[in-house]
Amino acid sequence: MSKRHSAKYKLDRRMGENIWGRPKSPVNSRAYGPGQHGQRRKSKVSDFGLQLRAKQKLKGYYGNITEKQFVRIYTEAARRKGNTSENLIALLESRLDAVVYRAKFVPTPFAARQFVNHGHVLVNGKRVNIPSYRVKPGDVVSVRERSRNMALVLEALQSSERDTPDYITLDAKGMSATFVRAPELAEVPYPVKMEPNLVVEFYAS
């Protein structure tokens, strides 16, 4: 098991939730944290602890975005007009790796980042290998023709674990997806409850 793969399941155990809704998550069989002290009785969590947990969960969901990147995204969300929590989610879902994952071209956000990094993705017909690339409404994200028969892609497209959300229009046959618009929090198909409002409180405090 790779370090990133192992870290992913470690996050599931630490949070006590199946963050990505995967059938192999260890919390499907045990709902306690990793390590020898994982089964200790949980104590009351402070407001700061709740805020930190919300940040770790949201950041981890998108493939463990670095703190530096996450702060940059939050700063832009806070600078924009409107609700900072909603802005934060809209920016996260506008990342190229997030769109690739939502389009079901790959099975996980971790795989999406690697897939983009390795040059398998086109945006409006041009190759883009930057996972954090900002996809705009109307942009067409597609899998390069020579990459379309990869087992990773074929298995993900056939998976019934998740559906493509309404803010992405999928052409499964052409292996392309149009990013219709940045979504609101309520539209994003998170398997668990995300609390961006607590993330905002964390950085604002």
UniProtKB/Swiss-Prot annotation:
Keywords: Ribonucleoprotein, Ribosomal protein, RNA-binding, rRNA-binding. Gene3D superfamilies: Ribosomal Protein S4 Delta 41, Chain A, domain 1 (1.10.1050.10), RNA-binding S4 domain (3.10.290.10). This is Small ribosomal subunit protein uS4. Residues 94-155 form the S4 RNA-binding domain. GO terms for biological process: ribosomal small subunit biogenesis; translation. Belongs to the universal ribosomal protein uS4 family. Signal peptide: none annotated. NCBIfam families: PRK05327.1, rpsD_bact. The keyword Ribosomal protein applies.
